[in-house]
Regions:
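Catalytic cores of Mg2+-dependent Asp-rich isoprenoid enzymes
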Residues: 1-194, 199, 203-331
Length: 331
């Protein structure tokens, strides 16, 4: 069975409120999605609209959990109230929220399980848990503070599952697939993306009290949390610091290798978009590697010209697929 519930666009009854809701989600994605949005452009419009609705939903959940003007307890309460409102909207209650309106429609059209969307929110809530008291772990230290950390890579991989692999599982339902192997490969692709994000954001996350690099890796390389929290010039990383970051990059490369096998398993009209997304994210990882893992001096990103070039290549793939498909029909 191919998992894609989208019917012909021309058979859908026009709904101005729904169209406006999708437009709002698209604007959110265009403004904030950066790498993701360029891949979205390579999708057919119905699938692009649905992906933008999912992104806008994720973005709002992240914004609630990241609102540092609120205490952690307040943010958790805010998130719970927001999820309750979403559940009511998904069950058919009237709502003024354009994200809920669009996502409720996308969920029905593409048979997205509610459980997966709940898991997305659970992933954002994981950032509200304090997992390490520095004094308890390392003894008295100047400016000791609580940290969000993960003891082992397996713990980190579990976090990556909720914040990224679940996104992949939602996306392939929108893309369309029939081979059950696609699910594990989508999970791996999500982990690859999240590990890349973690590498890129080491300094930014540390400033917010979050260290996603596994504590077992820090111990193995004799790197202290405070080193990462106070490092602002990555041009003089110690060997231990560089090897710590390189180890996570190697793990990401392994997940990219696994994730590439996903491409031929999804519907042909979604393959160019996935190719664009994987290519942009892998290019980001390579840029981090080429900079000697200096993610402290400035935020590493893929230049706009490079992203546009990758998108153009993705659009050419779409044109090629259409031409070869038309040729096959007339053969």
């Amino acid at each position: 069975m191919t998992l894609s519930a989208d019917g012909p666009e021309q058979n859908r009854v026009p709904n101005p409120q729904l169209a406006a809701a999708y437009k709002t989600c698209t604007q959110i994605a265009r403004r904030q999605a950066k790498n993701f949005y360029y891949a979205f452009l390579a999708l057919p419009k119905p699938k692009r609209d649905a992906i933008c609705a999912v992104y806008a939903f994720m973005r709002h959940a992240d914004d609630i959990s990241d609102d540092e003007s609120r205490t952690r307890a307040q943010r958790r309460a805010d998130l719970d109230a927001w999820v309750d409102a979403w559940h009511r909207a998904a069950a058919g209650a009237r709502t003024p929220d354009p994200v809920f309106i669009a996502l409720a429609d996308a969920r029905q059209r593409f048979a997205i399980p509610m459980d997966l969307l709940d898991q997305l929110v659970h992933g954002t809530a994981m950032d509200l848990d304090v997992t390490l008291d520095e004094k308890a772990a390392y003894g008295e230290a100047q400016e000791a503070r609580p940290w969000d950390t993960y003891a082992t890579f397996e713990d980190l991989r579990r976090y990556c599952y909720y914040v990224a692999s679940v996104v992949g599982l939602v996306c392939i339902r929108i893309f369309g697939y029939s081979d059950p192997r696609a699910e594990k490969l989508a999970e791996d692709t999500g982990v690859a993306f999240q590990l890349t994000n973690i590498l890129r954001d080491v300094r930014e996350d540390a400033e917010r009290g979050r260290i996603y690099l596994p504590l077992e890796d820090l111990d193995r390389h004799n790197v202290h949390i405070q080193e990462l929290a106070t490092l602002h010039d990555g041009s003089h990383l110690t060997l231990n610091q560089r090897e710590l970051l390189e180890g996570l990059a190697k793990r990401a490369e392994d997940y990219y290798a696994s994730g590439r096998q996903l491409l031929p398993l999804i519907s042909p009209d979604a393959r160019p978009a996935l190719w664009v997304l994987v290519t942009i994210y892998h290019r980001l990882l390579r840029r981090i590697e080429r900079r000697g893992f200096d993610v402290f001096s400035e935020r590493v990103s893929v230049p706009l010209t490079t992203r546009l070039s990758i998108l153009l290549r993705g659009l050419i793939r779409i044109l090629f697929n259409r031409l070869t498909g038309a040729a096959g029909q007339h053969a």
